[in-house]
Amino acid sequence: YMGVLRLGISHTCGLALLPEVLPKFQAEFPMVEFSLFEGNSTHLEDELAHGRVDLIVCFQPIMMEGVEVVPLTQEDLMLVVPRSFTDQIFGDRAEEMRKQFADGADIDAFQHMPFILIKRGNRTRNTVDQYFSRHFFKPKLILETENTITTLAMAEAGVGITICPELFVKT
């Protein structure tokens, strides 16, 4: 194979997957060049629909007529909570609760804590909003951003809680 592959990829997938996958692909197909388009999943779907990219890689399935979807992996979303928040909420039981939350957290415990989320229109955000709605949870939203790295950095700095794909947290 040779030519140019116009690849659309979400920011999150690009950061988490490209460094691992691209070298292997290039080793197997050295004559293929890439033209990379990064954006949120909704924008990438539009690019695909209008023929500006050949394929897209994103975390959540797309529903477009005439498009074949090939699942590569299943990705869980993670609640990322600053340590200071669990200390504040649970006091002496904070360490015990952090261990318990490793298997899943009851989001209601964080009802009055600040949240930092990806902007609406992003598929991850759509999934998060659906979860909130099903659980009658209204987050105290203090910041929305286009960039998952920003949400993670803010959580790490103790500014707020965020939710993002598991693979991204491990990166």
Predicted regions and their residues:
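Short beta-strand elements of ligand-binding domains
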Residues: 56-60, 82, 118-119
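C-terminal effector-binding regulatory domain of bacterial HTH transcription factors
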Residues: 27-31, 94-103, 126, 166-171
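Short Pro/Gly-enriched coil loops immediately N-terminal to beta-strands
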Residues: 11, 49, 69-84, 107-111
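Anionic-ligand binding region
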Residues: 63-64, 76, 84, 92-98
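Secondary-structure junction motif
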Residues: 87-89, 96-135
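Short secondary-structure boundary/capping segments
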Residues: 26, 68-71, 99, 106-108, ...
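Hydrophobic hinge/microswitch elements
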Residues: 40-44, 49-53, 58-59, 123-171
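Central regulatory/effector-binding core of bacterial HTH transcription factors
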Residues: 2-65, 145
